[in-house]
């Protein structure tokens, strides 16, 4: 029941956020963002509960999915804080448009990358096994072997993708004080992209 409620509320809250953005109404954005935050928290609790009750060991896909959910929760909290900041006159934390764009896009990039890698880690072994092996009995064994290969370095996969995303957040925060042509920003950008690869 909780899972169905989450699946119904997430699109409704996302539609509310989009409506708030289109109407440039911070109040609508905050209400929809609050609903989105509560729905995400309920979805995370439901996912963790289902995962624990299933008794299955974790995999790279589940690790990436949990980090993607954490990034989405953090991004929603930051978005609500920015909305509350905008309502105050003068704003408690003055920031430029470039900084706001950098933070929101970096958080979204982290969520998108983690969710994409989670989907690939889950679906790729099954797709490759279905394409390469015609016998059903051999396909299951081949798929298990591919899943083991995908999970072999799962801690390294998750950590490099996470640190690459955090590195981009650091680069975004460095733009407050340094020009874009700075060696620090260029080194941070290339180092983060190297971790993401």
Predicted region positions:
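Hydrophobic alpha-helical transmembrane segments of multi-pass integral membrane proteins
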Residues: 1-197
